[in-house]
């Protein structure tokens, strides 16, 4: 099974490249946000617990998210593998994901780290804000999101370096050029 974690700062192209990876390799897409919303909407036991945390303005605990992801994996039984979108974001989440996957006889195959210069990230996000109308794509919010990424999320790359799973992908250039680099990295893992 090919299990991919796609990683990068806001605006690095994770969504765009995820779609291409899914098509190219026939992977199932697991978006943590979608899973969380789905569990809450279906009013599952885990969904009710998560909703309680969210309504109190608290973060949903890692264990709960991992349990939800485990349920999705167990129900989907992906034949070729999975691309994880939005998870893990911290080292404890990465360790919990590894444990859960190991219990199912698999592991993360590769962590693709899309690396884009900060000026380019800001440019892309401001442009996306104009096109999509996303209210969180304004300069002040963008800078705040990038700060959070650098302080809280970026250290996760070092964890995957230690695991021998990290591949830095130059995220500059055309969509096709970037995807070419991704394919080269993934094909070396398969």
UniProtKB/Swiss-Prot annotation:
AMP binds at residues 32, 37, 58-60, 86-89, 93, 134, 145. Residues 127-137 are annotated as: LID. The keyword Protein biosynthesis does not apply. PROSITE patterns: ADENYLATE_KINASE (PS00113). Pathway: Purine metabolism; AMP biosynthesis via salvage pathway; AMP from ADP: step 1/1. InterPro entries: Adenylat/UMP-CMP_kin, Adenylat_kinase_CS, P-loop_NTPase. Residues 31-60 are annotated as: NMP. GO terms for cellular component: cytoplasm. Its main location: cytoplasm. Pfam families: ADK. It catalyses: AMP + ATP = 2 ADP. Monomer. ATP binds at residues 11-16, 128, 173. This is Adenylate kinase. The lineage of its organism: Bacteria, Pseudomonadati, Bacteroidota, Bacteroidia, Bacteroidales.
């Amino acid at each position: 099974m090919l299990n991919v974690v796609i990683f990068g700062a806001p605006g690095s192209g994770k969504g765009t490249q995820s779609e291409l990876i899914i098509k190219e390799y026939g992977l199932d897409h697991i978006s943590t946000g979608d899973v969380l919303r789905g569990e809450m909407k279906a009013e599952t036991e885990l969904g009710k617990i998560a909703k309680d945390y969210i309504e109190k303005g608290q973060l949903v605990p890692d264990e709960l998210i991992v349990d939800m992801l485990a349920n999705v994996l167990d129900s989907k039984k992906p034949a070729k593998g999975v691309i994880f979108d939005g998870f893990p974001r911290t080292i404890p989440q990465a360790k919990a994901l590894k444990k859960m996957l190991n219990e199912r006889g698999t592991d993360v195959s590769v962590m693709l780290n899309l690396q884009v210069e900060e000026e380019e990230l800001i440019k892309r996000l401001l442009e996306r804000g104009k096109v999509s109308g996303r209210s969180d794509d304004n300069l002040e919010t963008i800078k705040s999101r990038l700060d959070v990424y650098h302080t809280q999320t970026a250290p996760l790359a070092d964890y995957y370096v230690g695991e021998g799973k990290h591949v830095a992908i130059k995220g500059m250039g055309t969509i096709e050029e970037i995807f070419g680099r991704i394919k080269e990295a993934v094909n070396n893992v398969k």
